[in-house]
Each structure stands twice: as C-alpha cells, then as structure tokens.
Amino acid sequence: MTLTKVELADNLIEKHGLNKSEAKALVEDFFEEIRVALEKGNDVKLSGFGNFELREKASRPGRNPKTGESVPVSARRVVVFKPGQKLRARVEKTKPKS
C-alpha cells in the first residue's frame, strides 16, 4: 500500500479536525518548503524522521540498453533520503505484509 498526499490530508482532517482545504494546503505547503530548500541547495533535516541530502553525481559513461551504444551521462545533482535512527528502528520492528 502507498500513502498519498490525499491520504495524508485525510489523516489530518481525522486527527486534528481541520477542514479539507486547510488539510490539503498544509500538506502542499509542507512539501513545497522541502522542495524550495532543496532547490536552494540546502539539506532538509527532519528530527526523528530523516534527512534529505543533495549529492553531486559526476559525469560518467553510460550505455543505451536498446542499442548497446556508449552514451555520456552528464553530471547532475540528486536528492538522497537518509532515514533517521528512530524511523529505522520503527520500520525494523514492523513485520512486512505478505
């Protein structure tokens, strides 16, 4: 199962009595703040949850899987999520659904 932004908003409505537009705006604003920080080149640290970090990837040779032709892959910046210790511990305790 995947948790969506709509489901996050629904959970806020249920747990905190927000109306639908407030909950949706809160979820959108939360993710927008993370996006803006990352666009500015800042890491995002959410205590008890984890960190979103920016990493620079160097250019490298790649390969077109269809043709086998060698293709250069340009340098780029990527976002990496590193879960915090508390999140890792909680996930490790949870039994996977079959």
From Swiss-Prot:
Swiss-Prot/TrEMBL keywords: DNA recombination, DNA-binding, Transcription, Transcription regulation, Translation regulation
Keyword DNA-binding among UniProt keywords: yes
Cellular component annotations (GO), alphabetically ordered: cytosol
The keyword DNA-binding is annotated on this UniProt entry: yes
GO biological process, any: regulation of translation
HAMAP family assigned: IHF_alpha (MF_00380)
Family according to the record: Belongs to the bacterial histone-like protein family.
Subunit note: Heterodimer of an alpha and a beta chain.
The protein's role, per its UniProt record: This protein is one of the two subunits of integration host factor, a specific DNA-binding protein that functions in genetic recombination as well as in transcriptional and translational control.
Name of the protein: Integration host factor subunit alpha
Lineage start: Bacteria, Pseudomonadati, Pseudomonadota, Gammaproteobacteria, Pasteurellales
